[in-house]
């Protein structure tokens, strides 16, 4: 499917009716087991929503559907008024402004905390841009603000593989924040964290 690239820009998401995410009548089955059964969920632009339930309730599956990792058997999923997420690839969905943190942190372990944020920040991922482009003052400020927000200023030059589990969780959240997504999905963000890390 060909997606109009202009629709993938954050500022073009049509939320005039308030909702940024529409999930309607979504069903997902795995070998006869219904992980989601006729799910309806509406999230307004700027709204904070927590989905709580036991293991196996379908929370991760719902996020998989929104991010294109899993296709629903039935139902519709829209980002804003016009982007049908069921017809888009994972890349297109991420590029449209939906960020996701998985249960298990995925960071570049051999790079520093700062380098992880820098890699996440760049929108153009071609090899030459990644190797030779210098950060603008605004991008440096974004990284510094994010380091402060996630509590990793002192660890900025520490390799990510040496961080404690909770710090790694925060780093991955920071990697999403520097991308400035319009919708952020975070799966079990405090799993394995100590009281001090949360």
Q: Where are the model-predicted features located?
A:
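Glycine-rich phosphate-binding loops of nucleotide-dependent enzymes
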Residues: 2-198
